[in-house]
């Protein structure tokens, strides 16, 4: 019997560390689930606030690292068409979106997936919906939340 497939979207992932807690949270989640689930991750090929790609990963292709598949997208590949191709090339049982204010790793995947009935999507808000957080860059966040509702 094949394993349940999970596709994770996260702006920054290992070997990155500058985005802090979210990277470690997802890395820990993956470490605990990878023996029971088939996990794939789509992320950037740079660390937070960096423009130089990681030197030890191959960009724009699926690689296997520690038993999971990872796609490190270069800046020029961050697009609707790339995300659409990656989502469509394989069937996933669950989609995990880490965060809510990311164009490429939340909003675009939601718009692509909105017509796929039966897809189970988990959005990890990670404190981004707290009153204090919502008051910082309020207009931008309200726009994102409206667009997420439209993607239903």
Regions found by a protein language model. Give the residues of each.
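N-terminal subdomain of nucleotide-sugar transferases
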Residues: 1-56, 61-64, 90, 148-151
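Short, flexible loop segments at the rims of nucleotide/cofactor-binding pockets, characterized by
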Residues: 17-19, 70-75, 134-142
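Short glycine-/acidic-enriched loop or helix-start segments at secondary-structure transitions
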Residues: 18, 51-52, 82, 105-108, ...
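Glycine-rich, highly charged phosphate/nucleotide-binding loops
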Residues: 55, 70-84
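Structural motif corresponding to alpha-helix initiation and N-cap regions
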Residues: 77-81, 107, 147-150
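Short N-terminal targeting/anchoring amphipathic segment
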Residues: 85-105, 109, 118-122
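Nucleotide-sugar donor phosphate/pyrophosphate-binding loop at the beta->alpha transition
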Residues: 120, 130-152
């Amino acid at each position: 019997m094949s394993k349940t497939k999970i596709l994770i979207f996260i702006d920054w992932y290992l070997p990155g560390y500058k985005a802090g807690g979210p990277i470690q949270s997802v890395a820990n989640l993956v470490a605990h689930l990878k023996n029971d689930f088939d996990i794939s991750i789509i992320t950037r090929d740079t660390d937070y606030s960096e423009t130089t790609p990681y030197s030890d990963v191959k960009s724009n292709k699926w690689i296997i690292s520690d038993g999971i598949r990872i796609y490190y997208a270069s800046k020029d590949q961050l697009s609707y068409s790339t995300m659409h191709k990656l989502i469509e090339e394989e069937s996933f049982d669950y989609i995990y979106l880490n965060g809510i204010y990311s164009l490429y790793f939340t909003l675009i995947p939601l718009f692509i997936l909105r017509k796929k009935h039966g897809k189970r999507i988990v959005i990890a808000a990670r404190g981004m919906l707290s009153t204090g957080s919502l008051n910082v860059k309020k207009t931008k966040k309200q726009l994102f939340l409206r667009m997420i509702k439209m993607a239903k």
